[in-house]
């Protein structure tokens, strides 16, 4: 159990000048403050030598304040935005030890991300979101953790399902890159990590994931996403391979060499409702 408190203050100055030889026609500033406090706790119940249940909870409350303004001929109109919200998140997990080297587990948890301001230049077109709201998710996971008796080989593997509500997305609206909310989404997949240590000093690891993440509902038309669209920047396949070898140089000195290889499948970029209309393209 415990508690935390954090406060983040951000100040973003800027100038607007059409010609270096002319005086500034606007001095612009954006001030943002984020304040949060939270209390949390976890408890584990041992139901015999092989079976454990762990429960956890966290309550947090955050406040945000955004102030944008400036001076000069083309200074933006004053903008003030305040938000305040509290949220309770939780988790529950069960683990069963098949043996001293093999364990099965399941886990379900609720997550949360606070909203915030979009830092934009002055006089943006109407309909450009100045702020974005919080989002939340519930994740479900089941997996296995196992290793050989001599620890020369180990593997972690899990399948997962995630349900999002009001998912935060990076998008382009009126030619400005910003954060917006996109309704409901889901993600299903599988991930694994395998590690091989055949000899002293030599380690080979391979990890990968398959993820199918899509919108469940249409977004706001300004965002440009439709139900069934893949989530941005989420490759379907992701594989990483790493190899390291270390050896002694005598005394306390060691040397090592290593190499890594990463492969990703293609992925969608951010949503942009105006891209197709601008270039005469149809949606796939």
Give a label for each model feature:
Residues 97, 103-111, 131-190, 195-197, ...:
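Membrane-embedded beta-barrel scaffold of Gram-negative outer-membrane proteins
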Residues 23-30, 69-81, 124-131, 176-181, ...:
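Extracellular loop and loop/strand-boundary signature of outer-membrane beta-barrel proteins
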Residues 1-2, 55-57, 92, 106, ...:
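Membrane-embedded beta-strand positions of outer-membrane beta-barrel proteins
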Residues 1-99:
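Signature of Gram-negative outer-membrane beta-barrel scaffolds
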Residues 2-18, 65-74, 116-125, 167-175, ...:
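Outer-membrane beta-barrel translocator domains and adjoining extracellular loop/strand segments
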Residues 35-43, 88-92, 128, 138-142, ...:
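Hydrophobic, lipid-facing positions within transmembrane beta-strands of outer-membrane proteins
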Residues 4-6, 59-65, 108-114, 121, ...:
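Transmembrane beta-strands of outer-membrane beta-barrel pores
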Residues 49, 53, 161-163, 180-271:
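Gram-negative outer-membrane beta-barrel transporters
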